[in-house]
């Protein structure tokens, strides 16, 4: 990812291979970055995206009532977006501001390597530099989840990278728990 970020000449969209996107997803994902200079990242709603999960917040979900992606997204598309600030973007499908990338730097390969936590660390560094990470509340993408790593390796990486994240950003869990308690998009 860092190799691509170094070559970027414009804003960037990171998308996992286990994600399906609807029509006009890129426009909606990137619009907040074009509209407001101090937005570092944008993340849509999805089935499995922790603080961006729908219908059950912070859970892995199946597609709502078995509906196809496009039908669910058609409902989200009608929402007047608020773009609430979040403590982190979520890397399954995340827009990144090129100016923020250049100011904050690249993903921390030394502490996170491949896997999990690198986007959370980057987003925390972006906040420290005066940026915001926002939820794109008028976009829904399907994240099949779990296809990136075998289960045993996933658990090991999650533990190691979570520990590294908390060493670098001791308030991360508190900030994320506060966001979850507030659940600013509950009405959706």
Where are these regions (language model features)?
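Glycine-rich, basic loop-to-helix element that forms the pyrophosphate-binding segment
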Residues: 1-8
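Short beta-strand segments
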Residues: 15-17, 40-46, 95, 135-137, ...
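Conserved donor NDP-sugar-binding/catalytic core segment of glycosyltransferases
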Residues: 19-61
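A short, conserved alpha-helix in the catalytic core of glycosyltransferases
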Residues: 24-30, 85-105, 110-140
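A recurrent flexible, glycine/aromatic-enriched loop bordering the glycosyltransferase active site
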Residues: 48, 62-99
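Active-site-adjacent helix/loop segment of glycosyltransferases
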Residues: 50, 56, 120, 124-188
């Amino acid at each position: 990812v860092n190799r691509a970020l170094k070559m970027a000449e414009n804003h960037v969209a990171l998308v996992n291979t286990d994600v399906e996107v609807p029509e006009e997803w890129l426009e909606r994902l990137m619009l907040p970055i074009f509209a407001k200079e101090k937005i570092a990242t944008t993340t849509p709603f999805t089935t499995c995206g922790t603080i961006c999960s729908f219908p059950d917040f912070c859970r892995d979900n199946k597609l709502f009532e078995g509906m196809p992606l496009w039908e669910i997204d058609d409902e989200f598309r009608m929402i007047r977006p608020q773009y609430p600030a979040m403590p982190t973007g979520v890397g399954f499908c995340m827009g990144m501001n090129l100016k923020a990338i250049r100011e904050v730097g690249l993903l921390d390969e030394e502490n996170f390597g491949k896997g999990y936590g690198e986007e959370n660390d980057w987003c925390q560094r972006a906040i420290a530099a005066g940026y915001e990470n926002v939820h794109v509340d008028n976009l829904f993408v399907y994240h099949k989840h779990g296809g990136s790593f075998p289960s045993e390796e996933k658990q090991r990486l999650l533990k190691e990278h979570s520990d590294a994240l908390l060493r670098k950003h001791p308030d991360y869990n508190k900030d994320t728990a506060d966001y979850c308690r507030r659940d600013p998009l509950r009405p959706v």
